[in-house]
Amino acid sequence: MISYPFFSLSPPGLVPPPMAVPPVEMYSGSFWNRMRKPLPLRTQVIRFTVVFVIVSFILAVALQITHERMPDPKVTKPLPDLGFELLTKISFLSVVTDVLIAFLSSLSFFTLWKLYLLHRHCVGSGEPELPCNIPGVSRFFLSVWLCKENCRIELRNVHTIAWIRFITSYALLLLFRSLVIVMTSMPTPVDKCQNPPKIENPVKNVILTVLTAGGGSIHCGDLMYSGHTVILTLHLMFHWIYGAMVHWSFRPVVTVVAIFGYYCIVASRSHYTDDVLVAIYLTIATFIAVGHNADGAPWQLQLFIRWLPCCGANSREVTEDSQPVMVAFKSEAVDELRERDDSAGLSCEVSTNEV
């Protein structure tokens, strides 16, 4: 065998095999600049909402797997829990938790509507009008509410950015929960799951889980961490930041409702105390990490939706919610023409350009 010096690339006349060379632009600054360029806010709203629906189906499948893997309640008893020892068991409070979540969801949509009105007021669009004026009702729903003491955020597109922040945080938390509930199966303390029903139609159960947010489907054993606590805390964070911009009372009201909801979850034995505590921490940390940004979601999250072939454009051809501005150009030549026309009894009209 012929040996070559260590510094020899190849023997004379030997052509090395072709190698796949990645495009230069993949490693260039221009490529990553394009990847970090923010998507239009409208595109983010649509695509992140689609992603949330997909994540909801993933969670529904995970709930079904967890239901089948749950330890037999007749063999494995619930784990010792300090919250269960301190709080008296009140089973019907699980229904109260759902009512509290429905109330906070309605309040959040109302706040989002008021944020949209603030955006319209900021861009000079004015208040919308109903086809028929209803005394009191029209003023309540269509008037602009603003608490200046708590308003430290740019009002333009605030409703869109708030929705993107909420829905991306919720999708991340549900996706992580889908993984966690499948990994470790714990004995359930829930009364209705002590004799868990058999799932006869898995596909129907998955669809019902998505359509009813879990209320109309069969699922047991999804303990770590609490989904009810996630949505309660998300509403709490949403109103702590954005609700306070609309009215000062939203912060204390939502805080009291959320704390009472945590109590209902533990007192009804729907979750262990650790399920609630971990969910509170993860939700607050995720909401803060996503943050409020004029470009919408962090660019790392936008990478996951940039490749979708539908649901909006990837570039901002026109500035969103832009308003036409009239600019008048004045020059000495125009002044001279105006003086000549005035002296001749003619009128000279200064042209304006819309940019």
Curated annotation (Swiss-Prot):
Keywords recorded for this protein, A-Z: Kinase, Lipid metabolism, Membrane, Sphingolipid metabolism, Transferase, Transmembrane, Transmembrane helix
Q: Which GO terms describe its biological process?
A: ceramide biosynthetic process; sphingomyelin biosynthetic process
Q: Among its keywords, does the record have Transmembrane helix? A: yes
Q: Which residues cross the membrane?
A: 45-65, 90-110, 166-186, 206-226, 252-272, 276-296
Q: Does the keyword Cell cycle apply?
A: no
Q: Which residues lie on this side of the membrane: Cytoplasmic?
A: 1-44, 111-165, 227-251, 297-355
Q: How does it sit in the membrane?
A: Multi-pass membrane protein
Q: Locate the active site.
A: H228, H271, D275
A Pfam family this chain is assigned to: PAP2_C
* Molecular function GO terms recorded: ceramide cholinephosphotransferase activity; kinase activity; sphingomyelin synthase activity
Output a single Gene Ontology CC term carried by this record.
endoplasmic reticulum membrane
Query: Where found in the cell?
Result: Membrane
Q: Indicate where this protein is primarily found.
A: membrane
Q: What is its EC number?
A: 2.7.8.-
Residues in the Extracellular compartment per record = 66-89, 187-205, 273-275
Give the family per the record.
Belongs to the sphingomyelin synthase family.
The record's section on PANTHER family has: SPHINGOMYELIN SYNTHASE-RELATED PROTEIN 1, SPHINGOMYELIN SYNTHETASE
Q: Briefly, what is this protein's role?
A: Bidirectional lipid inositolphosphotransferase capable of converting phosphatidylinositol (PI) and ceramide to inositol-phosphorylceramide (IPC) and diacylglycerol (DAG) and vice versa. Direction is dependent on the relative concentrations of DAG and ceramide as phosphoinositol acceptors. Does not function strictly as a SM synthase. Essential for viability of the pathogenic bloodstream stage of this human protozoan parasite and, consequently, can be considered as potential drug target.
Q: What is this protein called?
A: Phosphatidylinositol:ceramide inositolphosphotransferase
Q: Which organism is it from?
A: Trypanosoma brucei brucei (strain 927/4 GUTat10.1)
Supply the source organism's classification. Answer: Eukaryota, Discoba, Euglenozoa, Kinetoplastea, Metakinetoplastina
